[in-house]
Amino acid sequence: VRFDDDAGLDTSEVQDLRGSGGGGGGIGGRVALGGGGLGVVGLIIYFVLSQLGGVSIGGGSGSALSGGLGSVGSGQQIDNSRLESECKTGADANKNHDCAIVAIVNSVQDYWKQQFARSGSTYRPAPTKFFNGGVRTGCGSATSDTGPFYCPADSDVYIDLSFFDELKTRFGARGGLFTEAYVLAHEYGHHVQNLLGTSRKGTGTGPTSGSVRLELQADCYAGVWANHASTTPTESGKPLITDVTQDDVASALDTASRIGDDYIQEKLGGGQVDRSKFTHGTSAQRKKWFTTGFQTGEPARCDTFGTSNLG
């Protein structure tokens, strides 16, 4: 994925909580934080750790990660000075990782602003917050082990960019910038669900649960954005992203295959797969729904709650 060198970046859509604004490195699903946070892999990781004698996970949306995390990182003060000075154009995004994340956030939100407008609604932007180590949110406290997540209580996306390194080393994903784009687009899919009132359906565990359907829909929404990424204009009238290659799509699908419930439970949980604990869907399902969104480019095709065939 590459960015138009001349396109402007909007750093106001990202808030840097990393203290002095230092650099980071870069996945997301459903995490049950104090107020019902939604992340790509967080709850799975904590389920696996609990099975291995690590943390204890409670039931429901109000108990899993809000307590017992020990001290979380400081740096709750927003300091965007570095982003503002370094991330001005697409040319900056092509050479600076933090700026690339800003560009991806801009592109995803530009798409949803325009999609909501086409349907006669108004999209309310949500900031992505960079943090290191730990963070306090409207959904409770979380550490970087949670993975990237969306908090409906404050309508923010949270990400410790170093988690993408763990995605490669611990989960075996191939990585790459479009992997990170897929994760961010997935989290913004949760924001869309929150705006549309769909988030409340994401309850329970198991292969056909509302939780799984919510996550697969967010994967599909990520695919929809990917379909439109190189054609969605910014305020200047030109798309921020110039192209999405087949290799980009392959990296997203590879990531989806590494964050399915079955893959993570088997890889990190000693080979045991408990379908009753599924919260995100299998690797095959996650690939299927991202592909559905990418191939159709239509949010309406992401109705995971209206189908008996999740894949």
Where are these regions (language model features)?
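Active-site recognition of the HExxH zinc-binding catalytic motif
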Residues: 112, 159, 182-195, 219, ...
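Post-HEXXH active-site segment of zinc metalloproteases
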Residues: 194-216
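Catalytic zinc-binding patch centered on the HExxH motif and its immediate surroundings
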Residues: 58, 134-160
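Short pre-active-site segment immediately N-terminal to the catalytic Zn-binding motif
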Residues: 165-182, 206-212
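Acidic helix-start/capping segments at beta-turn-to-alpha-helix junctions
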Residues: 87-110, 117-140, 239-247
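Pan-zinc metallopeptidase signature
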Residues: 260-311
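Short helix/loop segments within enzyme catalytic domains
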Residues: 103-105, 109-111, 115-116, 217-264
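Long amphipathic alpha-helical segments used for membrane anchoring, targeting, substrate engagement
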Residues: 1-86
